[in-house]
Amino acid sequence: MSTTTTMRAWTYMQSGLPSQTIVLDDEAPSPSAAELGPDELLIAVNYVAMNSGFTTLMRSLPPQPYSLPHIYNRQKRLGVPEFEFSGRILAVGSAIPSTRPDLQPSTLVLGCCAAKRVFIEGKGALAERVIAPAAQLIPLRPLSTVTTQDDESPGPDPAAPPISLLEASGLSACGCTAVQVLDLTKLVAGDKLFVNGGSTSVGMLTIQVARQVLGQTGTIIASGTDTTLIRSVGADDVIDYTAQRPLHEFLRTHHADRPFDAIIDCVGVAELYTHCEPYLAPGKLFINLGAMTAKPTFWGLLSFVWNQHMAPLWPVVLGGVPRSYQFYSARPNRETLGRVMRLVERGELRMVVDSVWEMRDAKMAYKRMESKRAKGKIIVRVQEE
């Protein structure tokens, strides 16, 4: 049973499969209001959305991987995983009343833990309470107005949030990624986009945001095995990658005559980029969001990171690809979170949930993540709303 000084939290002390390395601590030290910086808030966590990238890190690196004291000595490492969550504000830092009056105690919020707390201090979100920066939080506000098609339609309830607290838990990092990556592509109405990994959580959000950018005249092609689901979020066509191998050969054969104006890879398949010249238009961008193909070892992850940095630098005369490349990860901030929520409020963006697990069953949730068969977000209910 947690108290004001202790809480339930899942922790891990070594690299490996999360389903095998995490341990539930019923008396983990709880953060308190006394620890808050001026721009930080104490949150009671209700839901945590799991992230495939964090699973890759946990398999390859120990907790607090960027903490210098741990790198240079054998000091015990301990970490709480994950960073995306939703919950209720318990306390606010001294600057919050003047800088963020929308963030007050008892307000429902969605957001992310600061990278410093997760990767250096080992204080992630899979716990009953977390400290998070105001810049990476946004309130889950009720709809401000009721819009109806006619007088007989009741319209949405203005007192109800546009999305549930459960669904909101997966919108901060993934939602910001989808919005920011579409900005990077500079796509316009009528363009053609390929999304690899269309049934991943970030893939489905990216497709939905892209539909708003491209309009009905644009074309969105995605890869995946659940055609109905991927089409339901806005894709025009779905390629079953299990039936079309290698995928890059299928794309070369069927899309070289009208190349894509951008490719967004949510999985991290290197061959898609190295062979993309025929099916990605000159001057257009290939963006990788995924690391699902990285080998789950320290050296495997190091090799993956090295390749991400070298891909855009390798000269064409030495075998490089004559197309621009960028590896991108989310940069959650207030402005982008606001854009995400406006899309949600207009009914243009929704979170697809693969499965929901109780706090005690987090190991099973990680097994689902490790299977790489999830279609949408895997969510852990930390405590009741």
UniProtKB/Swiss-Prot annotation:
<dbReference type="GO" id="GO:0000166">
    <property type="term" value="F:nucleotide binding"/>
</dbReference>
<dbReference type="Pfam" id="PF13602">
    <property type="entry name" value="ADH_zinc_N_2"/>
</dbReference>
<dbReference type="InterPro" id="IPR011032">
    <property type="entry name" value="GroES-like_sf"/>
</dbReference>
<comment type="function">
    <text>Trans-enoyl reductase; part of the gene cluster that mediates the biosynthesis of oxaleimides, cytotoxic compounds containing an unusual disubstituted succinimide moiety. The first step of the pathway is provided by the HR-PKS poxF that serves in a new mode of collaborative biosynthesis with the PKS-NRPS poxE, by providing the olefin containing amino acid substrate via the synthesis of an ACP-bound dec-4-enoate.</text>
</comment>
<feature type="binding site">
    <location>
        <begin position="372"/>
        <end position="373"/>
    </location>
    <ligand>
        <name>NADP(+)</name>
    </ligand>
</feature>
<protein>
    <recommendedName>
        <fullName>Trans-enoyl reductase poxH</fullName>
        <ecNumber>1.-.-.-</ecNumber>
    </recommendedName>
</protein>
<dbReference type="InterPro" id="IPR020843">
    <property type="entry name" value="PKS_ER"/>
</dbReference>
<feature type="binding site">
    <location>
        <begin position="64"/>
        <end position="67"/>
    </location>
    <ligand>
        <name>NADP(+)</name>
    </ligand>
</feature>
<feature type="binding site">
    <location>
        <begin position="156"/>
        <end position="163"/>
    </location>
    <ligand>
        <name>substrate</name>
    </ligand>
</feature>
<dbReference type="InterPro" id="IPR036291">
    <property type="entry name" value="NAD(P)-bd_dom_sf"/>
</dbReference>
<dbReference type="GO" id="GO:0016491">
    <property type="term" value="F:oxidoreductase activity"/>
</dbReference>
<keyword id="KW-0560">Oxidoreductase</keyword>
<comment type="pathway">
    <text>Secondary metabolite biosynthesis.</text>
</comment>
<keyword id="KW-0521">NADP</keyword>
<feature type="binding site">
    <location>
        <begin position="309"/>
        <end position="313"/>
    </location>
    <ligand>
        <name>substrate</name>
    </ligand>
</feature>
<comment type="similarity">
    <text>Belongs to the zinc-containing alcohol dehydrogenase family.</text>
</comment>
<keyword id="KW-0547">Nucleotide-binding</keyword>
<dbReference type="GO" id="GO:0005739">
    <property type="term" value="C:mitochondrion"/>
</dbReference>
<comment type="subunit">
    <text>Monomer.</text>
</comment>
<feature type="binding site">
    <location>
        <begin position="289"/>
        <end position="290"/>
    </location>
    <ligand>
        <name>NADP(+)</name>
    </ligand>
</feature>
<feature type="binding site">
    <location>
        <position position="241"/>
    </location>
    <ligand>
        <name>NADP(+)</name>
    </ligand>
</feature>
<feature type="binding site">
    <location>
        <begin position="223"/>
        <end position="226"/>
    </location>
    <ligand>
        <name>NADP(+)</name>
    </ligand>
</feature>
<feature type="binding site">
    <location>
        <begin position="199"/>
        <end position="202"/>
    </location>
    <ligand>
        <name>NADP(+)</name>
    </ligand>
</feature>
<dbReference type="InterPro" id="IPR050700">
    <property type="entry name" value="YIM1/Zinc_Alcohol_DH_Fams"/>
</dbReference>
